[in-house]
């Protein structure tokens, strides 16, 4: 059994294959996922699992150098945005429109779908290097 906290084999598999600047998205339960992008569906019921707990778990395993967030998030869901900033600390944030974020999903290695129902609870994580 794995010693790290992330137990989901599909997420671990995607992360293990990611290189520098590859992208992985985490989305709320309403985020449209392109057919060509791998979907890792964790949604069980409304709110479970949550976006924040999923983000925390993935960040324990993935080195991230930049995050892409819809600029609408800060205004529409300020509490969520504050929590994201606390978690990612000094990681670079690039703001794009929600429509642009949805287009970027086509270039992601996968989208992790949560049960989150907070508006704009979506993020794209750009992989960094550990050296």
UniProtKB/Swiss-Prot annotation:
Cited InterPro entries: D-ribose_pyranase, RbsD-like_sf, RbsD_FucU
UniProt key word Cytoplasm: yes
Top-level EC class: isomerase
Catalysis: reaction(s): beta-D-ribopyranose = beta-D-ribofuranose
Gene Ontology annotations for the cellular component aspect, listed alphabetically: cytosol
SUPFAM superfamilies: RbsD-like
Oligomer status and interactors: Homodecamer.
Family per similarity comment: Belongs to the RbsD / FucU family. RbsD subfamily.
Name of the molecule in the record: D-ribose pyranase
Organism: Clostridium perfringens (strain SM101 / Type A)
Classification of source organism: Bacteria, Bacillati, Bacillota, Clostridia, Eubacteriales
């Amino acid at each position: 059994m794995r010693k790290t906290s992330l137990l989901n084999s599909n997420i671990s598999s995607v992360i293990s294959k990611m290189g520098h600047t590859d992208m992985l998205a985490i989305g709320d339960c309403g985020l449209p996922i392109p057919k060509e992008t791998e979907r890792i569906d964790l949604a069980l019921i409304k709110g479970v699992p949550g976006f924040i707990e999923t983000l925390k778990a993935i960040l324990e395993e993935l080195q991230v150098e930049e995050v892409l967030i819809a600029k609408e998030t800060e205004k529409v869901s300020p509490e969520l945005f504050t929590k994201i900033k606390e978690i990612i600390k000094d990681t670079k944030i690039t703001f794009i429109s929600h429509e642009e974020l949805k287009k970027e999903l086509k270039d992601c290695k996968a989208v992790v779908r949560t049960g989150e129902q907070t508006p704009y609870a979506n993020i794209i994580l750009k992989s960094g290097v550990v050296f």
